[in-house]
UniProtKB/Swiss-Prot annotation:
Protein name per its UniProtKB record: DNA mismatch repair protein MutS
Signal peptide positions on this chain: none
Organism: Escherichia coli O6:K15:H31 (strain 536 / UPEC)
Binding site residues for ATP: G614, P615, N616, M617, G618, G619, K620, S621
GO biological-process terms attached to the record: mismatch repair
Pfam families membership: MutS_I, MutS_II, MutS_III, MutS_IV, MutS_V
GO CC field: cytosol
GO MF assignments: ATP binding; ATP-dependent DNA damage sensor activity; damaged DNA binding; mismatched DNA binding
SUPFAM superfamilies: DNA repair protein MutS, domain I, DNA repair protein MutS, domain II, DNA repair protein MutS, domain III, P-loop containing nucleoside triphosphate hydrolases
InterPro entries: DNA_mismatch_repair_MutS, DNA_mismatch_repair_MutS-lik_N, DNA_mismatch_repair_MutS/MSH, DNA_mismatch_repair_MutS_C, DNA_mismatch_repair_MutS_clamp, DNA_mismatch_repair_MutS_core, DNA_mismatch_repair_MutS_N, DNA_mismatch_repair_MutS_sf
Keywords, ordered alphabetically: ATP-binding, DNA damage, DNA repair, DNA-binding, Nucleotide-binding
Protein family: Belongs to the DNA mismatch repair MutS family.
Job description of the protein: This protein is involved in the repair of mismatches in DNA. It is possible that it carries out the mismatch recognition step. This protein has a weak ATPase activity.
Nucleotide-binding is among the record's keywords: yes
Length: 853
């Protein structure tokens, strides 16, 4: 920070600021001064750039002008949102002392720290996306990873075994803020991510972590959570929890448990697969035309977030899946009645988190009340649904009649945004508050009554009651009648023609009225805090209710989608395989203006690989992706876009579909392609679904063909994975003749002159041609270029109609591992010592090598 070294030379106020800033050197400090939050020195310069606000100077301290920038306190949320979106963290420093009684600067302290991963304010969060704080740890045995959604209390840990799995977890969870140890070795894994925070090693100590977690959950050990034997995950979780406590400056009662996420419990998808399948984000980085955009018609934000978690973590437990299927089927006749009521529930999950953090605002409590008011109707509607899982959700959501009654009595119908604005607590809730409000609102009536009463009592017709800003309330009597003033009248002010008095009753009333607004507001704040105390004992049950409501929203939504989009319930089978009748791509069918051409698929242990050929734009990639998406939907318990589906166990989904240069890492398209291919070949199993599209196209024809052949052979013969293998190498269509479990299918097209019509229908057998020139013409390549290409094609076909095919077969794939026969010239050169040759001997060797070549 650009500050003078001599601390004592600063003004008392700046000394206070500098002490607070020294405690938070790496983040911006919002320092409350009256109606503004001020920033000074380097913070002011940074904020002026980040927020586009004016940079000014505030006098001088220690002889130097102080750079300053400020924002109005009532607009702070908008500015915080901008900073958080840029990955910045902010310490909020408030005035906690009373200016009237303070000697020197008003006492101030940092009351909270706003960071990208620990925000809970509604204005700072995207309502339909999780906002995660994460921590990563690494030792010689692997990684530890923990995530916390502070806006819901959801706390998870895992222990990814290798770099690829860790990268997939980072891509799946996409944390807003990531904590890492100062000696973290795999920086290339996290570099470039938003919200990186370097933390000291001691925060990751295992003993500290266990102590922190036991203290948080009120337990003696962590056995009950199933995380006792996950030391790497616990190291990450301990650091994460400590950071959350440090930033919130309060207890975190809504974080009540921690859950271990195990690799074997869900279908694993690496980063490339999530990207290529466009689950929640399309390839351009947006949310349009994704699987979530089709499936997510949930009516609550918390339901939307839960559905996205399901999509990114499909479960393998068929008991869970069958229960979801049964529930979706049972709910299909009730969606029209349930969704309007569920819509009124709102985002109860995040409201409860703010309640736990004691940052809930009046409108949060009003929304909570509104959610409670929907529960009786919801429960009544669900009573008619013949489904045990639905009835379990109905019981779990509860009714909370007492809490509903409390909030109906306590909070007005439409409260202001902030409790400090007053007028939050309803009339009739607290007698003392009503009195203070009556005093503040009813001073005029009281003074009129007092004036009438005192005139009658004293008989003085010139007596009147009034108010003066300097002297307060008074009773005024004309000079001519002042000698008749009662003995209990104490003179307050003498005027030319009148005397002004005060009586104990009026003085007491004056004190009440002058402080009634302040007293009413202070009492209102106290009563508001007491509401938290009355609600928080029910937090656990309320969180269970919110979870049940979110799950109900997801299941009702999937029931509506199944009915509206004509989906079918898939059947799970024990053996590996996928059989699809009339399958459709869930996203493409929604954006097409013409009917989607449905296609079948049959993969089984006896038919493990399909070699897919056909023209570009013919639908090969769509066919492959729809298979993966149907499998993914089945494994979240959803119905699927097909006439009939039977699907066996799946442990992983891999996609090697399309590629682009990774310029940031210095990797070419071909290198990216080969890296993804290597990951598949190392990690796929017989229970994996593998999509391979155009392997080997980034290098020379023979190199690419050889690699594609070897990869296909490895997947079919050794790994035995369920594989869809799209290619333009027609030589690969010979694979079914050379190995078991491989079949050809193709997507056809009709060519007429210079035009081509894509049939988009999958047929058995290999394609007859690739139609590449017709597609090029369709794309607008100049006619003379197309004409020349046709000539060249005829030349090449006449020269070598089947050259590649004669070179590549199942017995010759050893060319990838066995070097070509070395020429005699090369052998002679390898045995030659050039330093020992005379000029004459060198000349002789040149002639000898010439003869060998």
């Amino acid at each position: 920070m650009s500050t003078p070294e001599n601390f004592d030379a600063h003004t008392p106020m700046m000394q206070q600021y500098l002490k607070l800033k020294a405690q938070h050197p790496e983040i911006l400090l919002f320092y409350r001064m009256g109606d503004f939050y001020e920033l000074f020195y380097d913070d002011a310069k940074r904020a002026s750039q980040l927020l586009d606000i004016s940079l000014t100077k505030r006098g001088a301290s220690a002889g130097e002008p102080i750079p300053m920038a400020g924002i109005p306190y009532h607009a702070v949320e908008n500015y915080l949102a901008k900073l958080v979106n840029q990955g910045e963290s902010v310490a909020i420093c408030e005035q906690i002392g009373d200016p009237a009684t303070s000697k020197g600067p008003v006492e101030r302290k940092v009351v909270r720290i706003v960071t990208p991963g620990t925000i809970s304010d509604e204005a700072l969060l995207q309502e339909r996306q999780d906002n995660l704080l994460a921590a990563i740890w690494q030792d010689s045995k692997g990684f530890g990873y923990a995530t916390l959604d502070i806006s819901s209390g959801r706390f998870r840990l895992s222990e990814p075994a290798d770099r690829e799995t860790m990268a997939a977890e980072l891509q799946r969870t996409n944390p807003a803020e990531l904590l890492y140890a100062e000696d973290f070795a795999e920086m290339s894994l996290i570099e470039g991510r938003r919200g990186l925070r370097r933390r000291p090693l001691w925060e990751f100590e295992i003993d500290t972590a266990r102590q922190q977690l036991n203290l948080q959950f009120g337990t003696r050990d962590l056995v009950g959570f199933g995380v006792e034997n996950a030391p790497r995950g616990l190291c990450a979780a301990g650091c994460l929890l400590q950071y959350a406590k440090d930033t919130q400056r309060t207890t975190l009662p809504h974080i009540r448990s921690i859950t271990m996420e195990r690799q074997q419990d869900s279908i694993i998808m690496d980063a490339a697969t999530r990207r290529n399948l466009e689950i929640t984000q399309n390839l351009a980085g947006g949310a349009e035309n994704t699987l979530a955009s089709v499936l997510d018609c949930t009516v609550t934000p918390m339901g939307s977030r839960m559905l996205k978690r399901w999509l990114h973590m499909p479960v393998r437990d068929t008991r869970v899946l069958l229960e979801r299927q049964q529930t979706i089927g049972a709910l299909q006749d009730f969606t029209a009645e349930l969704q309007p009521v569920l819509r009124q529930v709102g985002d109860l999950e995040r409201i409860l988190a703010r309640l736990a953090l004691r940052t809930a605002r009046p409108r949060d409590l009003a929304r909570m009340r509104h959610a409670f008011q929907q529960l009786p109707e919801l429960r009544a509607q669900l009573e008619n649904v013949d489904s045990a899982p639905v009835q379990a959700l109905r019981e779990k959501m509860g009714e909370f009649a007492e809490l509903r009654d409390l909030l109906e009595r306590a909070i007005i119908d439409t409260p202001p945004v902030l409790v400090r604005d007053g007028g939050v607590i309803a009339s009739g809730y607290n007698e003392e508050l009503d009195e203070w409000r009556a005093l503040a609102d009813g001073a005029t009536d009281y003074l009129e009554r007092l004036e009438v009463r005192e005139r009658e009592r004293t008989g003085l017709d010139t007596l009147k009651v009034g108010f003066n800003a300097v002297h307060g309330y008074y009773i005024q009597i004309s000079r001519g009648q002042s000698h008749l003033a009662p003995i209990n009248y104490m003179r307050r002010q003498t005027l030319k023609n009148a005397e002004r008095y005060i009586i104990p009753e009026l003085k007491e009333y004056e004190d009440k009225v002058l402080t009634s607004k302040g007293k009413a507001l202070a009492l209102e704040k106290q009563l508001y805090e007491e509401l938290f105390d009355l609600l928080l004992p029910h937090l656990e049950a309320l969180q269970q209710s919110a979870s049940a409501l979110a799950e109900l929203d997801v299941l009702v939504n999937l029931a509506e989608r199944a009915y509206t989009l004509n989906y079918t319930c898939p059947t799970f089978i024990d053996k590996p395989g996928i059989r699809i009748t009339e399958g459709r791509h869930p996203v493409v069918e929604q954006v097409l203006n013409e009917p989607f051409i449905a296609n079948p698929l049959n993969l089984s242990p006896q038919r493990r690989m399909l070699i897919i050929t056909g023209p570009n734009m013919g639908g090969k990639s769509t066919y492959m992706r729809q298979t993966a998406l149907i499998a993914l939907m089945a494994y979240i318990g959803s119905y699927v876009p097909a006439q009939k589906v039977e699907i066996g166990p799946i442990d992983r989904i891999f996609t090697r579909v399309g590629a682009a240069d990774d310029l940031a890492s210095g990797r070419s398209t071909f290198m990216v392609e080969m890296t993804e291919t290597a990951n598949i070949l190392h990690n796929a199993t017989e229970y994996s679904l593998v999509l391979m599209d155009e392997i080997g196209r980034g290098t020379s024809t023979y190199d690419g063909l050889s690699l594609a052949w070897a990869c296909a052979e490895n997947l079919a013969n050794k790994i035995k994975a369920l594989t869809l293998f799209a290619t333009h190498y027609f030589e690969l269509t010979q694979l079914p003749e050379k190995m078991e479990g491989v079949a050809n299918v193709h997507l056809d097209a009709l060519e007429h002159g210079d035009t081509i019509a894509f049939m988009h229908s999958v047929q058995d057998g290999a394609a007859s041609k690739s139609y590449g020139l017709a597609v090029a013409a369709l794309a607008g390549v100049p006619k003379e270029v197309i004409k020349r290409a046709r000539q060249k094609l005829r030349e090449l076909e006449s020269i070598s109609p089947n050259a590649a095919a004669t070179q590549v077969d199942g017995t010759q794939m050893s060319l990838l591992s066995v070097p070509e026969e070395t020429s005699p010239a090369v052998e002679a050169l390898e045995n030659l010592d050039p330093d020992s040759l005379t000029p004459r001997q060198a000349l002789e060797w040149i002639y000898r090598l010439k003869s060998l070549v």
